[in-house]
Amino acid sequence: MKITIGIPAYNEEKNIAKIIVQLKKVADQILVCDDGSTDSTSEIAESLGAIVIK
């Protein structure tokens, strides 16, 4: 069984890294739905291995 977790995000560059790091301990795949962020949320999420949907 594989676990996928989806995270909605908007301008969460200050929080997204620690959330993804913690979720990677229990999830096989992390999807971040970026709702038009104007900061580095998407780039940070991608650098940590999350799949980003814009």
What are these regions (language model features)?
Residues M1-K54:
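Structured catalytic core of nucleotide-sugar glycosyltransferases
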